[in-house]
């Protein structure tokens, strides 16, 4: 069962809502958390993706590390440079301190996937999905 913009438990003050949360019907806990973000190939775009990853990591912690899979999904129109995935891997392996001072630990038993959707703008102005890529970061 999936929920969009699902709030995570409030344990450290900041409101976090995963873009998509997939729940186990039997356990009634989240199995998969997903964040989506447009990526424009800039440093600012890289920072936005990192912020989305931090949301995933903190949301997982707040759910008691229940999710078995976290997915960071980036999409773009046209050709842009690829994001630096090593930054994401290090964030997952090292953890971080949240904006409210909560320590988010490194991931232990959670898979992290990075997916990309590359769209092309057609002459009619519509978008056409040209490529999809998905790889496991952890």
Residue ranges and their predicted role:
Residues 1-28:
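Active-site metal-binding core of divalent-cation-utilizing nuclease and nuclease-like domains
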Residues 20, 34, 70, 112-114:
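Hydrophobic beta-strand residues in large extracellular and virion-surface proteins
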Residues 20-22, 30-40, 56:
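Conserved catalytic cores of phosphodiester-cleaving nucleases, focusing on short active-site segments
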Residues 24-27, 60-66, 96-105:
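Alpha-helix termini
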Residues 31, 68, 124:
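Conserved acidic residues
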Residues 39-95:
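Catalytic cores of nucleic-acid endonucleases
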Residues 72-138:
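Domain-level recognition of nuclease-like catalytic cores that cleave nucleotide substrates
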């Amino acid at each position: 069962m999936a929920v969009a913009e699902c709030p995570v438990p409030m344990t450290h003050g900041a409101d976090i809502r995963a873009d998509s949360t997939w729940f186990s019907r039997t356990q009634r806990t989240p199995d998969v958390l997903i964040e989506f973000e447009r990526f424009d190939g800039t440093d600012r775009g890289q920072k936005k993706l990192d912020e989305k990853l931090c949301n995933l990591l903190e949301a997982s912690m707040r759910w008691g590390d229940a999710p078995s899979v976290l997915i960071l999904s980036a999409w773009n129109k046209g050709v842009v440079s690829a994001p630096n995935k090593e930054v994401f891997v290090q964030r997952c392996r090292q953890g971080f301190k949240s904006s409210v001072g909560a320590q988010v630990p490194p991931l232990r038993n959670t898979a992290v996937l990075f997916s990309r959707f590359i769209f092309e703008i057609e002459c009619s102005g519509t978008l056409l999905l040209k490529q999809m890529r998905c790889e496991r970061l952890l």
